[in-house]
Amino acid sequence: MPTYFQRPENALKRANEFIEVGKKEPALDALYDVIKSKKHRTWQNKIHEPILFKYLELCVDLRRSHVAKEGLYQYKLICQQVNIASLEDVIRYFLKLAESRAVEAQEDSRKEASAELDEDVDIEDLDQIQTPESLLLSFVSGEDTQDRTDRVKLTPWVKFLWEAYRNVLELLRNNVRVEKLYHETAQQAFKFCLKYTRRTEFRKLCDNLRNHLNVTLKHQGQPNSVNLNNPDSIQMHLETRLAQLDSAISMELWQEAFKAVEDVYGLMQLSKRPPKPQVMANYYQKVALVFLKAGNFLYHACTQQRLYLLMREQKKSITSEELQKMASHVLLATLSVPIQVSLSNTEKYLELDEVAREKSKRLANLLNLQNTPTRESLLQDMLKANVLQYVNTKVHCLYQLLEKDFRPLDLCAKVNEVCQYLESCDDADLCQYIKPIQNIAVTRLLKQVSQVFQTIEFSRLMALVPFMTEFQLERMIVDIAKEKNLQVRLDHRTKSISFGLDLHVAHREEVPEGPYLQAMPSEGLRNQLTLMSVALQRSIFTIQHDHIKAKKREEQEQMAQNYLRTARKEHKLMLERKTVIEARKEYLESVMQERERREYEKIKKQKVENQEAEQKRLDEERRQREIQRRRQELQDIEKRQAMDKIAALKKTTVGAKALKDLSPEEIDNMNADDIIAKQVEQLDKEKRELQTKLKTQEKKVDYFARAMRMEEIPLLNKQYEEHLVADREFWENQEEERVRKAIEEHEKLVETSARLQRMIPDKDAFINTLRESRTEEYQAKFQAFQAKLEQVRKERLEVRRKRRIKDRKERKKIEMEEAKKREQEEKERKKEEKERIEREEREAKEREYAERIAKQNEIDRKRREKELEIERRLEERAGVGQVQQIRCLFITGWGDHEDGGDRWRDERGGDRGPDRGGDKPGAWRPKWQREEPDRGGDRWRGGDRRDGMITMS
């Protein structure tokens, strides 16, 4: 695209011109160049908004979602500090365009599908509406006509709309100025997924929103970021997550619904204010539905109870019918909770399923529960809340039947009557509890029957359960036995059911639960010592009644005395406890006040930071305005220069033609580049006019030739018909001539064949004679060839034998040379190895010699130091003169280097060690190793020398 459309209004005009001629791609490129240009970052309402609207229309027409995203991002940089409402209008317009195009595509798809169906109906017989071709196509592709048209027409626009929602959400995330639009777009995206049943896109949308929330939490406190401490922000997030939860439930995506529940709970925990009762009621309703669909009746019942308590406390104008309906829901949900395996206290402590415990704790946190609920705790809470008095009378008896009465013979019959009543009710939500309550009734029946009968026929048990088939009842019994909830055994041979185990077998302790009559026989045998202890205690109490009574009286008197003795102290402790409680309350109040003060200071600090940021923004805008003013001055200077060029251009022929159609306003808006462009445009215009004239002339010639062809068409048709008649006559004549000639030729050939039959004997005799003569000649030549072949073979064999002999000699010679070379290399290697060993030995000896020299030098150095020390001491004791005498004695007696280096070298005789010549007379050795009697011998190395020196002093 040309780069000289620098002014935005010119680019918009140019884009409209491209659109008028059907070139949308160049129009989009022209607008994109203006949007991304850094020269036009100062926002102007009358210029930038029309450009963005036109730009987005082109993006929607061409389905360029990534180009639209880039344009919106650039426009956000332009107007977010000046007028954020303009960005909101542009985004809403973009989404509206995309949605309208998707709706139009859906309508077109439906019309096309119905038209194809109408065509199929009109074809062939009405008795066979489905043709074999249509059946094969539907079975092979798995699609009907509507699906195929949707894939072609609707799917591209649905994909574009999804990308539009995703890009807009990514653009608006974590920006407090467009927070409301962000949540509106998210809710529109949920409606889009629900309308077009886009399950995969819904999951991606939920993940994106979750990531956006994490980014918001990570970048708290930054300028223009969303503040989750603001109640309005939390409320908008809650509304969005509740809309997400509604959409997930409508699409039956229960995993996403549970994740949405966790998100809602997390937002509630972030909020410093408690949520509104309406929000909590909606939350509990959705959570109860999610738990019900997941089959978790325990937490479903718990959620129903929380909803019931919330509605009864918060809703002031609740009617008796609503209260009765809610209470019935709570009762049925609580009774539908499966009966858990009763555990003893020891078994409860031995349970180590950390995964299940963590899961239960996680679910309990969603309902703000401190402890994990159980069926017994839910029943107790229901009784404490006095739910039974509001329950429907037909449903009220269920609690008595399943939890209180011991009536195994008509329990299921009574429960079946209540279930039939629930099926006949107008409230369809009550019917979802029928199956769980029937299962609970069968469990209660089996437990009660096990306490009365040891063995019962299966047919009789079937008669007690009217709402289950034989297979369902058997499956129920097996499940109960598998969960170790009952000691039961099925005997298919006798078609009976046995309760209890052998008397000597008891796998676990039996804990009474529900209506209870008596224990199992094995349980009695297992607890026989406990029962004996109870009986003995009763006997002792009966025999020693007076003694035990007197002992209890003494204990009571002792307790009374202890109380009187410590009553004042206990009273004082209670008063002190009251004081401690009051102090604790005051401390908590002070902590709350301090927290509020800190929060107020934090908000105040945030306001100050916002004001500073706003001041920085204003300063930046002021600086930008100054830059714009200077840029405008430069543009004015350039404008004056351009006007001078225009005045000069008008004096030329090309310039006059180029500027004659322009208004003064357009001339005022031109710069130097525009002037050059106008000159080039005028030249191009003249060239185009010439080409247009040539094209017009060409069209005239084309029209004339076309008219001539149109006129000659009838004549050509007539000529063609005449040619057909003439060609047919010609073909018939030629065909008759061909047949006649063929007959004549056949007759001639027959006559020739009869004439040539007489020549056959002569032909055979000639061929035989020729064959005999040629055979003899062939045999002679063949024998000559064999002889020559044998001779050539012998010559070649001789040549090959000689070549092999020569090759063997050369190979042997080469091997001998290589062996000789290897021997020479081996000798050189051994010689080098020997030299290396000698060199290493010589270096080792030199190192040893150097070490000995170093040791000798060290010894000499120490000796000289010792002599100097002795001289110093002697000077201190006897004076300088005596020291000189002693020094002379030392020099004369010990033969130091008075005579120079030659004397020292002459005295270097003696043993130099084993490596220096051994005991040879001329071998060198250190002076301290020599034995010289006249110099003192060993006394030099001992204490005599020191003693002699002291004597001399």
From Swiss-Prot:
- PANTHER family found in the cross-reference section: EUKARYOTIC TRANSLATION INITIATION FACTOR 3 SUBUNIT A (PTHR14005:SF0), EUKARYOTIC TRANSLATION INITIATION FACTOR 3, THETA SUBUNIT (PTHR14005)
Where in this chain does the record put each PCI domain? 323-504
Cellular localization per UniProt: Cytoplasm
**One GO CC annotation:** eukaryotic translation initiation factor 3 complex, eIF3e
Functional summary from the UniProt entry: RNA-binding component of the eukaryotic translation initiation factor 3 (eIF-3) complex, which is involved in protein synthesis of a specialized repertoire of mRNAs and, together with other initiation factors, stimulates binding of mRNA and methionyl-tRNAi to the 40S ribosome. The eIF-3 complex specifically targets and initiates translation of a subset of mRNAs involved in cell proliferation.
Q: Which Pfam families match?
A: eIF3a_PCI_TPR-like, PCI
Question: Region entry Disordered: which residue ranges?
Answer: 603-623, 810-861, 893-953
**Keywords (A to Z) from UniProt:** Coiled coil, Cytoplasm, Initiation factor, Protein biosynthesis, RNA-binding
Task: Spell out the subunit comment.
Answer: Component of the eukaryotic translation initiation factor 3 (eIF-3) complex.
Species of provenance = Nematostella vectensis (Starlet sea anemone)
Protein name in the entry: Eukaryotic translation initiation factor 3 subunit A
Biased composition (Basic and acidic residues) is annotated at: 812-861, 895-919, 928-953
InterPro entries named in the record: EIF3A (IPR027512), eIF3a_PCI_TPR-like (IPR054711), PCI_dom (IPR000717)
Q: Which GO terms describe its biological process?
A: formation of cytoplasmic translation initiation complex; translation reinitiation
The record's similarity note reads: Belongs to the eIF-3 subunit A family.
Keyword Repressor listed? The answer is no
Tell me yes or no: is Cytoplasm among this UniProt entry's keywords.
Answer: yes
Q: Which Gene Ontology molecular-function terms are recorded?
A: mRNA binding; translation initiation factor activity
Q: Which HAMAP family match?
A: eIF3a
SMART domains per record: PINT
Where does it primarily localize?
Answer: cytoplasm
Please list the coiled coil stretches: 593-642, 670-704, 732-877
